[in-house]
Amino acid sequence: MELKTAKLRYLTTETDGVLTETFQILCGGEWIDALRTEGFPTVAAPAPSAEGGSKDGWEALGDLNLSKEECAFELKKTEMHRRRGVETAQTYGIGPLGEVIREVRLDETENVAHVRVSFVPSRHDNIGSIEDKLFFAPKTRKHIDGMNGPLDFIWSQQIKREESNYVPHWCFKSPIVMFQQGSVFAAVVPDLSAADHVYLEEFPLGLDLGVPEEDYAWFSCGIISGGLDPHSEVHGEGHSYYPRFDKPIRCERKGCVVFSYDLLLSEEPVRQGFRRGVHYLWDRIGHQQLMQSIDNQRNPLDASLIDFEDWAELVWYDTCDRDYTAFPYEGRDCGLLTSRRVMDTIPGATEMDGWYQIWAQSLRTAYGWAMFGIRTGDREITERAKGVLNAVLASPRNGGAFPAILSLDRDGGVTWFNDDTWAGFRDEYHTVNMGWTGYWLLQWEDLCSELAPEIEQMCRELADFFVKQQNEDGCIPAWFTQELKAEREEFREFNAECSAAALFLAEYYRRHGGDAYLKSAEKTAAFLVEKVLPRNRWYDLEAFLSCSPKPFDFYDSFTAQYPQCNMAQVFAAHAFLVLYQAGGNEMWLKEGMRITDYTLLTQSVWNHPLIRKRATLGGYTTQNTDGEWCDHRQDYIAVTLMDYYRLTGCAEYMERAIAALRAGFAAYPYENFAHCGENGMNYISGINWGIGTAQVSAEQMLPVLGDLYVNLSYDQAFGVNAVTVLSFAHCQDALYLEAEAAEGMRRNLHVSVEGANEQSRYRVFVNGTGAGTFSGEELNRKGLDVVVERTGTRKQIILP
């Protein structure tokens, strides 16, 4: 059989009753094998204990102690079908566990192969899994080192500790497995269109892969019994890996198990085919989910909390009043916003702690608090927020290095710690923490001009320290002793978390100049491109410490992947953006978009229907050995995505930014949700890694975006604050906007506008009603206020 489009071809051949299935792509003008599977592609694993029998009308099989080979499906027949102009190739298989029909059709428009598998079991509980297992045609190489591996690119949401591990639907943030060798790219994406909570409870979708050396890599998609390691705990060795289980998948009597998936097969730039996967997931799933979830920022603890302004009241008054402590220190009026974490990780510390670290960054929280105080004219708030800045400026400095955590002692004294013991080493200065704190010190120059000279001095000392300590290849060691020596072997020669230092150096140069600082930032950026990107070794503290500890030399030989965490990616995406803004070098924008796209693989493209009480669309997970949803790093990347949109006009960036912003509020009061992928195991870490983190992003983004955002440079419009834009048109001097607001949201909304021609005048219509005529200059400067009476409702169910 053969199916063919302009860029994709599907072939089946039969030799002595054995099926060979091949998917080919047009590559360099020639047809090249992308997937080639010998034997029937569908495979089933028997459940160890089966019930039923002839009394239920099923064929009795007796003892199901069958080997995998004995459970294989034999080819029964192949057929071509044509209906309404669409050709479908069908293959029929039969085996002791049941019968299967596979349907393949090619989509010329999307350049995708759609596959549907229907399996009728011989008995209702005789399988532990049913899946299609497809082999990547290019042969793998031998693993050599961190630069050269079996394939040019491999990606899955989770990696393995044991061969039986897989990727369950609980980890489907971006449900895809991808391979690339040279320009040959292949990916499998499960079809989630029918995957509601009822379907997933009965038929647990899963993905799997294997990448053996000097052989053929494979990926699979189907129904797989399994889940979180039952021995896994946050502190345990099993966190978070997902083994297959022996539990049978129960099918209704004479029932049929159905699952579908898409294959993305194409010629792509080397190591960049993943970007097709990223965009496909959003186009196919994420965009639709965003349009259907107008109130994702509504929190189940209080349904009235939906407007970002309502959240601001909760955060900046109630929560900050609870968590703020003022204290005198070194002749300054200082303050802290407690995270209540340090007493758990550093013996002798109190719960009155101030964190200046990559997660609980009090300086960032206080910055957003001060922004709120300034825009509302509340001077008391602004002064209290400035107390957090004063504490950092008063911290003990050592050749430019400074500590990350303070503890307010019970006698009123202050004790500083260079790092915590949860994800660092208490007595050593940590580069990533200092870089992130330094970046936020620089932001405070905009709000606190009277302290700007002191801020600049502290930041210059830190910048000089980084320049001095930088390795020849651009990497900056992670940890330094009190004598400012990089003695710790871990992360000394290689790490990706130095991206935070690159961000700080680029921002310092952008504000204050200094060729040495630009050169150092670019040197670190080049290191990330040359040494990290080839095999995506995004090594940072979370990948090996924190709640998923593992040896620093851990390598997953089953999938040929390294541990990686997205915090280093988030800092890198931001750093490359600032480098471009500071120097105008298009290369940094190009590489920054590449890294930004890669981070999007850890963003949820759907509201998982089995996650209870919380919307998950837009939320970020952390790494490939953890499982949380809606972790607050999504608040960091939301601002960066908005900035990339404003530079590029890529609508996906803005939609993802809005989804990420909303997800931070859905997670309240936790630092993330469903920590191990499944429901439960949630933690509260305080305002600095929680609702405050989200509200700071809102304070940064809403002055740009308003409740609705229109960009006339790109002729695009977006709903932001519990609003959905249904359509937008720019016709000569008229702007037509169709929008709806969530139930419970105010009707008087602000539209922010960018890119209007300042010499033009525009007539604005909202839901068919004229809103007035405005000059382009007026729209750019202050936008306009409109009334949106139309109400939109959620189109998705969130389980209680």
What is the predicted role of each segment?
Residues 5-7, 95-99, 769:
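Glycine-centered tight beta-turn/hairpin loop motif at sheet-sheet or coil-to-beta transitions
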Residues 30-264:
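Beta-strand/loop-rich accessory regions of lumenal/periplasmic or secreted enzymes
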Residues 129-138, 742-760:
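Surface-exposed beta-strand/loop patches in extracellular or lumenal glycoproteins
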Residues 32, 769-774:
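Surface-exposed loop/edge segments in extracytoplasmic proteins
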Residues 138-151, 754-770:
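Solvent-exposed beta-hairpin/edge-strand motifs
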Residues 114, 163-171, 177, 185, ...:
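Glycan-recognition and catalytic cores of secretory/periplasmic carbohydrate-active enzymes
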Residues 6-36, 41-52, 469-473, 580, ...:
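Short beta-strand segments and strand-loop junctions that repeat across beta-rich extracellular domains
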Residues 693, 774-800:
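C-terminal beta-strand-rich structural cap/linker in extracellular carbohydrate-active enzymes
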